[in-house]
């Protein structure tokens, strides 16, 4: 849910639960999504290779991160169809409610398409294509609800030498964040009010400026901020205590709010992956802030509000 605090005259979004669709995505459908049986191997994630993240107590940690080194093209099953190559790779993280994928090498060719879906084929995210390439050559996906997922790459065979896809981190959701705010957990937030409620009417612009940030297996909130040039540079005002791991792997979610005043989850179908840290000062020596810049422009369709100088 999203909440606001009238006492501080600021909109605060408690970035909580749900499963998302991808970062900026494009047209296309996975070729084997409707195939009832796929004979592919699954890479079993070694959960001994956990990455030790010491999140600040004010960060909501929902998942573990596991260190891997998976060369997608090398490990995937290849299916040839005329002049097209289709690669399928299964990944299993036993006991996970959902899995996220971080690529430390990510570069797609002009005509390639990449998809992610659960083993049950209940939904997919994608396509990702060359427009998702970044100067950092990295990308983090949103969460796919299953402990067994499939990654599908479709590419013209003549473009194979252009591809770079290497996975270095698996995010393992151990809290079932999609169902986190059930009766068991919801009592802790009973004093808060969803921003969709009437009490938020005077704060609609500021609500559109607050976003959810996923840092590996942790969640925080942040604000999009403007600058005196008013040029829509995607600056993000963040808390330094939330900075954890590489900012290039952060996922930013926009318009995460319930459709009803008593709802317990929000839409996560608008997101962007990747950022850099421009400045920061910690809680002990200063105001506990970090200034980030998202590495992609925020689409107008997200209806972003840049707080300050607007």
Question: Each PLM stretch: what is its role?
Answer:
Residues 108-122:
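Short, surface-exposed beta-strand/strand-loop-strand elements in extracellular ectodomains
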Residues 222:
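Phosphate-binding active sites in nucleotide-utilizing proteins
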Residues 23-93, 172-191, 195-197:
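A short aromatic-anchored loop/beta-hairpin motif
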Residues 7-22:
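Sec-dependent N-terminal signal peptides
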Residues 144-219, 227-310:
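Serine endopeptidase catalytic core focused on the charge-relay Asp
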Residues 93-100:
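Extended extracellular/luminal ectodomain segments enriched in beta-structured repeat modules
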Residues 1-6:
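N-terminal secretory signal peptides that target proteins for export/translocation
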Residues 122-148, 155-159:
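Beta-sandwich interaction modules
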């Amino acid at each position: 849910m999203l909440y606001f605090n009238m006492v501080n005259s600021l909109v605060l979004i408690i970035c909580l639960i749900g499963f998302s669709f991808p970062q900026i995505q494009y047209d296309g459908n996975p070729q084997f999504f409707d195939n009832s049986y796929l004979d592919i191997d699954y890479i079993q994630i070694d959960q001994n290779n956990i990455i030790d993240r010491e999140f600040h107590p004010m960060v909501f940690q929902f998942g573990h991160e596991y260190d891997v080194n998976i060369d997608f093209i090398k490990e995937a099953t290849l299916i040839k169809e005329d002049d097209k190559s289709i690669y399928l790779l299964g990944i299993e993280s036993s006991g996970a409610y959902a899995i996220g994928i971080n690529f430390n090498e990510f570069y797609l060719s002009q005509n390639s398409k990449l998809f992610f879906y659960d083993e049950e084929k209940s939904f997919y995210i994608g396509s990702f294509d060359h427009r998702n390439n970044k100067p950092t050559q990295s990308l983090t996906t949103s969460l796919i609800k299953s402990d067994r997922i499939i990654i599908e790459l479709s590419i013209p065979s003549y473009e194979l030498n252009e591809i770079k896809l290497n996975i270095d981190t698996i995010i393992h959701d151990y809290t079932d964040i999609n169902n986190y705010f059930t009766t068991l957990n919801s009592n802790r937030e009973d004093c808060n009010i969803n921003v969709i409620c009437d009490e938020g009417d005077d704060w609609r612009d500021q609500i559109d400026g607050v976003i959810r940030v996923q840092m590996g297996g942790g969640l925080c909130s942040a604000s999009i901020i403007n600058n005196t040039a008013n040029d829509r540079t995607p600056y993000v005002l963040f808390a330094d205590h939330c900075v954890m791991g590489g900012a290039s792997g952060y996922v930013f979610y926009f318009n995460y709010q319930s459709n009803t005043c008593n709802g317990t989850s929000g839409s996560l179908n608008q997101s962007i992956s990747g950022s850099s840290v421009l400045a920061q000062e910690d809680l002990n020596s200063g105001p506990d802030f970090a200034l980030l810049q998202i590495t992609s422009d925020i689409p107008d369709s997200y209806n972003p509000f840049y707080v300050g100088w607007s």
